[in-house]
């Protein structure tokens, strides 16, 4: 559910960064990383996807589809722990990615990528197969 103050969007010249500001959903929601000699808690990819799908999965964004496909392909076992949170909006999410508005495809094409460069159709197939298997 969307609540006031639940989402934070930072805008930079290089692009936007969205944060879902909500309590953790998974038991192992974060890892401790060393950043310049300091211990920093960083949410796991599965936690990030769980929050995106649970709190706004009924309003697909290109970035959410991209991130979901990436995590499915790189960390599928970890993502299975998020199953209860992925099911909430699964049907609406699947309908929206399979019958996309032109703006969803355009948004996807505008994503700056580095080492993961899938097509929109590839991400739809990966997300669809995974979500239907739950």
Regions found by a protein language model. Name each.
Residues 1-134:
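Compositionally biased terminal segments of proteins
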């Amino acid at each position: 559910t969307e609540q006031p103050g639940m989402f934070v969007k930072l805008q930079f010249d290089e692009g936007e960064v969205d944060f879902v500001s909500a309590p953790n959903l998974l038991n192992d929601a974060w890892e401790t990383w060393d950043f310049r000699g300091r211990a920093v808690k960083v949410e796991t990819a599965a936690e990030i996807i769980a929050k995106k799908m649970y709190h706004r999965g009924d309003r697909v964004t290109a970035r959410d589809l991209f991130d979901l496909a990436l995590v499915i392909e790189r960390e599928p076992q970890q993502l299975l722990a998020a199953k209860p949170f992925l099911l909430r909006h699964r049907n609406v999410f699947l309908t929206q990615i399979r019958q996309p508005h032109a703006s969803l495809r355009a948004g996807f094409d505008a994503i700056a990528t580095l080492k993961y460069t899938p097509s929109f159709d590839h991400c739809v197939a990966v997300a669809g197969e995974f979500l239907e298997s739950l």
